[in-house]
Amino acid sequence: MRNEMNLQFSALSQNESFARVTVAAFIAQLDPTMEELTEIKTVVSEAVTNAIIHGYEGNPEGIVYISVILEEAMVKLTIRDEGVGIFNLDEARQPLFTTKPELERSGMGFTIMENFMDEVEIISNESFGTTIHLTKYLSNSNALCN
């Protein structure tokens, strides 16, 4: 059985933890392992932080959109912003690359997403924002939404 949740919130750094916890609570019905849940929470944190810091460049008037779809033992996340977009996506996906070194960012966001998720697709257009599609296949077959 398919179950879907949509969430939108202001691009404020304090909303990152709200997004992480809300997504984790929704996914809990699939009975993920603690490792899987931690990985998904980390990925949500990275993607939301990227939207706030890089997409909207700290402008709190921006909106971050999250969609979560649960199907059997699969989680599909979409995290989207309508910010400035990514100038060079290939460069941005390189480990340690950051456009904000003055903020002491590690530049590992996309690398973490690619390591923790089974599928990662990033679509970005300058001046039109970025959409990140993430898929995780859970190892536990005792999903409650089946």
From Swiss-Prot:
Keyword Transport on entry: no
GO molecular function terms attached to this record: ATP binding; protein serine kinase activity; protein serine/threonine kinase activity; sigma factor antagonist activity
EC number: 2.7.11.1
Record keywords, A-Z: ATP-binding, Kinase, Nucleotide-binding, Serine/threonine-protein kinase, Sporulation, Transferase
InterPro entries: Anti-sigma-factor_SerPK, Anti-sigma_F, HATPase_C_sf
GO biological process, one term: asexual sporulation
Catalytic activity: L-seryl-[protein] + ATP = O-phospho-L-seryl-[protein] + ADP + H(+); L-threonyl-[protein] + ATP = O-phospho-L-threonyl-[protein] + ADP + H(+)
SMART domains: HATPase_c (SM00387)
Function recorded in the entry: Binds to sigma F and blocks its ability to form an RNA polymerase holoenzyme (E-sigma F). Phosphorylates SpoIIAA on a serine residue. This phosphorylation may enable SpoIIAA to act as an anti-anti-sigma factor that counteracts SpoIIAB and thus releases sigma F from inhibition.
Family: Belongs to the anti-sigma-factor family.
Entry-linked PANTHER family: ANTI-SIGMA-F FACTOR RSBW, ANTI-SIGMA-F FACTOR RSBW-RELATED
NCBIfam families the record matches: spIIAB
Protein name per its UniProtKB record: Anti-sigma F factor
Organism: Bacillus cytotoxicus (strain DSM 22905 / CIP 110041 / 391-98 / NVH 391-98)
Gene name per UniProt: spoIIAB
